[in-house]
C-alpha cells in the first residue's frame, strides 16, 4: 500500500466539509472568547481587600480565614469591597520577594501582619556578642518604603492626616459634627461614577441607591477613625516609630500600628495572627509558644486604589481590634 504523503492527498483531506466545519467552530469559539475577555467587568483594586502575612509569622489560622469571611459577609467593609484575598508569605519560601513584588505592582495589597522582632538576617558580631542592625519592621520599610503609608496623624500626606482632611470635607469637623453634607457626597459620587463609567450605576435608580451607600461609607470611616483614636488613647494599640536607611535615604515615621503592645488587652489576637516564641521551662527545656505580643500591621499604599477607598484598611483593622480586645 502506498502511504506516501503528497500535496494532492493533503489538498483532498483539507477539502472535506467536516474539517471545514470544525475549523469554523474553533474560530468562532476563539472569537467569542476574545470578545468576552475584552468586555468582561474586572474587579478593580478598590473592590478587593488583600491581607499579607509576613514570613516570620506562623501560617494564617483557620480562625483568621473564618473571621475574614465573616467580615466580608457582614458589615465590616463598605459596599465597594466585594472579595477578599490573602498572601501568606510563610508558605513562599525563597520566593517571598518575587511574590510580594508581583502583588504590589498590580496593586493587590492592603495590610500586612508583621512582628516587631529582631531580623536574624541583620545579625553581626561585636566583642563576641551577637547584635542586630534591624528588626522586621525596619527591614521591610527599607525595602518597601514607596509602598507604605506613614500613619502619623499629624504628618501631612500620611494615611490618617489625609483621612481626617477627607472627612472634614463632608463634616466640617469630623470629631463633633452632628450633620454630614449628604448633597456634596452624592455629587462627588455621581461625578466619580460618570468619570469611571461604572457599570454598576447606569440608571437613576442605581445611582440613587449608590449615593445612599456612599453616604454610609463615609460614615463608616468616621466611626472607625474615632474608635481607633480611642483605642490609641487608652493604650490598647499604639503607633510604632520605625526608622530605616536605604542607600543614601533615611526614613523615619510611624509606619506601623502595634496591635498587641499589651498581652493583657489584645492576647486574643494570637488566634488570628501570631508567631512562635521560645520559652524555657522549669526543666530547662526550650519549647515554642504561640504569641501575638508586638504584632503590628502596616498599611500599603499601592497607588492603584482609587482615592479614599484605601480607608477600607482602617475598617478591617478596627474590626479586628474589636474582635480581639479583652472585655
Where are these regions (language model features)?
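Extracytoplasmic "Venus flytrap"/periplasmic binding protein-like
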Residues: 92-231, 235-236
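Composition-driven low-complexity repeats that form or flank extended alpha-helical/coiled-coil segments
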Residues: 238-247, 251-255, 259-260
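Periplasmic-binding protein-like
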Residues: 24, 320-327
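Extracytoplasmic/secreted proteins, especially bacterial periplasmic and envelope-associated proteins
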Residues: 63, 67, 95, 99, ...
Amino acid at each position: 500500500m502506498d502511504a506516501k504523503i503528497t500535496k494532492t492527498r493533503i489538498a483532498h483531506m483539507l477539502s472535506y466539509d467536516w474539517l471545514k466545519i470544525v475549523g469554523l467552530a474553533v474560530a468562532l469559539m476563539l472569537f467569542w472568547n476574545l470578545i468576552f475577555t475584552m468586555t468582561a467587568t474586572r474587579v478593580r483594586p478598590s473592590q478587593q481587600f488583600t491581607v499579607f502575612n509576613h514570613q516570620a509569622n506562623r501560617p494564617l489560622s483557620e480562625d483568621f480565614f473564618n473571621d475574614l469571611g465573616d467580615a466580608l459577609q457582614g458589615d465590616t467593609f463598605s459596599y465597594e469591597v466585594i472579595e477578599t484575598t490573602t498572601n501568606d508569605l510563610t508558605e513562599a519560601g525563597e520566593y517571598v520577594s518575587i511574590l510580594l513584588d508581583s502583588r504590589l505592582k498590580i496593586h493587590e495589597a492592603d495590610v500586612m501582619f508583621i512582628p516587631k522582632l529582631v531580623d536574624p538576617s541583620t545579625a553581626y558580631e561585636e566583642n563576641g556578642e551577637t547584635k542586630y542592625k534591624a528588626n522586621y519592621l525596619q527591614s521591610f520599610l527599607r525595602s518597601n518604603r514607596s509602598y507604605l503609608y506613614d500613619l502619623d496623624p499629624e504628618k501631612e500626606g500620611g494615611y490618617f492626616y489625609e483621612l481626617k482632611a477627607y472627612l472634614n470635607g463632608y463634616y466640617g469637623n469630623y470629631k463633633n459634627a452632628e450633620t454630614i453634607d449628604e448633597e456634596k457626597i452624592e455629587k462627588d459620587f455621581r461625578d466619580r461614577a460618570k468619570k469611571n463609567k461604572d457599570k454598576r450605576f447606569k440608571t437613576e435608580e442605581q445611582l440613587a441607591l449608590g449615593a445612599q451607600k456612599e453616604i454610609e461609607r463615609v460614615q463608616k470611616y468616621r466611626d472607625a477613625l474615632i474608635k481607633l483614636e480611642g483605642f490609641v488613647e487608652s493604650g490598647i494599640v499604639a503607633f510604632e516609630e520605625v526608622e530605616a536607611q536605604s542607600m543614601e535615604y533615611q526614613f523615619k515615621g510611624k509606619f506601623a500600628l502595634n496591635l498587641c503592645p499589651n498581652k493583657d488587652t489584645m492576647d486574643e489576637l494570637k488566634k488570628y495572627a501570631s508567631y512562635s516564641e521560645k520559652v524555657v521551662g522549669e526543666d530547662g527545656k526550650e519549647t515554642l509558644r504561640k504569641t501575638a505580643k508586638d504584632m503590628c500591621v502596616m498599611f500599603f499604599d499601592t497607588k492603584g486604589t482609587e482615592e479614599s477607598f484605601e480607608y477600607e484598611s482602617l475598617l478591617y483593622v478596627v474590626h479586628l481590634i474589636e474582635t480581639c480586645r479583652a472585655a
